[in-house]
């Protein structure tokens, strides 16, 4: 609220504890004070969201779905604002953006013998895009752990983007040391690593190796812990509440901050975009008679020297 005082209008925020109960939600809808609100930030429960979405549709009240990524009510309800880029659209957008970056690089897909990677859908879509455009790519299947010897067939004057078929940290740790060793031995090749939203949670040696390999990942959100805006909000949070904000991924405190910083100006000025500390909001209409969804997606580049760059796709 402290950051929203300059918006030029009084702000009234009410919090309701649904207690995980549909009955509590229905009870809230009968409250005279509740019916004066212009927007609802819905809870993380599908049944409760459905009730609120129907209320929003019948009363011309925007219902903001921040938590339920797989919910599809925005497709048929003009009052629902879907706060996350839907998965199918996320894969397509990430694939299209990556294709531009692969213009001068050979993609090398790395998988493990006898193991199914958890990113088969994304990898399949990317390979299809490469094939459609006539771009070549390579597949390397390794047994247990990638060794530098597994890469010796690659010309050392090449430019390569390694793409694991798994997002799991244990699998990434079985891949990166071998790539680093091969690159350092070969001296000349240009090497990058491309990966997944889950990688933004990795720390320690895994993160160090990601920086070493100039790694880029796609993600709906990211918090740069050392950014001045992050430090400023952390300091204000501790001042107001006495404790440090919970450090999770995503950070729920920052999610609340960014959501408030978007929703209030949206109600006042119909602003459809906001580039937040952690979450960005760039809404687009899903079609005639439909609601809208958040189109925000980012590339996070972990560069050598512990440099982190966040850019909107």
Regions found by a protein language model. Name each.
Residues 1-13:
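Signal peptide-proximal N-terminal region
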Residues 10-32, 144-154:
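Structural motif
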Residues 35-45, 64-66, 106-113, 157-176, ...:
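Periplasmic-binding protein-like
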Residues 41-42, 46-103, 115-122:
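Extracytoplasmic ligand/sensor domains, especially the bilobed periplasmic-binding protein
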Residues 74-81, 146-152, 199-213:
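Glycine-rich, charge-decorated loop segments at or immediately adjacent to ligand/cofactor-binding or catalytic sites
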Residues 81-176:
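Extracellular/periplasmic Venus flytrap/periplasmic-binding protein
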Residues 175-253:
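Extracellular/periplasmic periplasmic-binding protein-like sensory domains
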Residues 243-253, 260-312:
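Segments of small-molecule ligand-sensing domains
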